[in-house]
């Protein structure tokens, strides 16, 4: 163990097996017993330590995004956007920032087949000179619900039945029938994009609106888009069944093998920019996470490229203990008023403290690469060696000072304290536009998924009728096609 770096090092390795305390182990095969056939003795310390360590190897899996794979690389700025943001890592073309990226499925468990229909996570941690920036997104640009109060129920509805531990669509369709805004996400979820061939051939989105702030303090809303340079590829249902039956880790293997062979995955980063004064000029709320921004009005602007050129060294240390948090931003970036984003800022840090421990940010994969200093101290599994006497601020014995203030949005927000739904719900327009943009065979696959799951015997006539109504309000012909195959009449 290299004590200066708190990591295993060949220079510090013992030539023989030892206990955790460094004591020599001369037999790693046979337990200490009373005679060759007698009972095992508790004084076999190495046996007890070995079993106790094994019993505690696993940590709680993520409540969402449990199944995933990670890789390292860099982000390079290719286009100047310094007029939009004072973020140091975006300061000029050519600037490179080390990153680690994690791809995942959202609902399914750790160890589940990566070929299952699901939204995919697309999270990038930028180790910038001003701290970590975590862009925690998905491979679809929208989400099922716009308010985090529904998020726990959303995930429970999507996850297996608590009685049988089987994922059942009657639960999903029952719950989301109360959330008409979810139809837009279903227009992605039941589409081909939720069966990506692998992680290298899928897009990524920041999902939420954020804000970019320049040196003058001018703010713009921004949305982030990742576009794979090797194109988007998806599987059919039949291909997904075959691939999953052959190798349940096919996407992880593809990512690892591609990087090992020097075929480095690459994505281009684009942004959409909206003036903060223009949010009321649309027929929807631009800060509603169930909506996309029209690219004909707010075109994609190129920013940079993401290249993954290094495999992780240890799956547990750099995938299972890897922790993302949308609350991690840097100067020149800020949150929007998106209700779901605002609550993710708390929820992600909270779940990491539960899953990994209160000092999860000390782990090498999570710690910033830049200099950092605060008085967050001690706690379970703290391994930071600190010898200072002053553990408070301000102090005349500690030269640490406040950082220089950086620009943040200065808009004045007023309103009553209330729990309410946004004014411009417009739940069906974008779902219909997406459906009409597809070729007929793609439309038919989408219709077939609805028919398949609405045919579940536990889906009631009322639930079917509600979904036919939603689909018809999005696109009349789509609703009619689903209804005719279910022998129901659309209500719209």
UniProtKB/Swiss-Prot annotation:
Q: Name one GO molecular function term.
A: catalase activity
Task: From the UniProt record, list the reaction(s) this protein catalyses.
Answer: 2 H2O2 = O2 + 2 H2O
One GO term of the biological process aspect: hydrogen peroxide catabolic process
Annotated heme binding lies at 348
Name the coiled-coil region(s): none
Write out the annotated subcellular location.
Answer: Cytoplasm, Cytosol; Peroxisome matrix
- Keyword Acetylation listed: no
Q: What is its EC number?
A: 1.11.1.6
Q: State what inhibits or activates this protein.
A: Inhibited by salicylic acid.
> Among the entry's GO cellular component annotations, what is one?
peroxisomal matrix
Pfam families given for it? Catalase, Catalase-rel
Q: Which SMART domains match?
A: Catalase
Q: What class of enzyme is it?
A: oxidoreductase
Q: InterPro entries this protein is in?
A: Catalase, Catalase_AS, Catalase_clade1/3, Catalase_core, Catalase_haem_BS, Catalase_immune_responsive, Catalase_sf
- Necessary cofactors: heme
Active site, per annotation: 65, 138
Q: What is its main location?
A: cytoplasm
What PANTHER family does this protein map onto?
CATALASE, CATALASE ISOZYME 1
- State the function annotated in the UniProt record: Catalyzes the degradation of hydrogen peroxide (H(2)O(2)) generated by peroxisomal oxidases to water and oxygen, thereby protecting cells from the toxic effects of hydrogen peroxide.
Concerning its family, UniProt says: Belongs to the catalase family.
Protein name in UniProt = Catalase isozyme 1
Q: Which species expresses this protein natively?
A: Nicotiana tabacum
Q: Which gene encodes it?
A: CAT-1
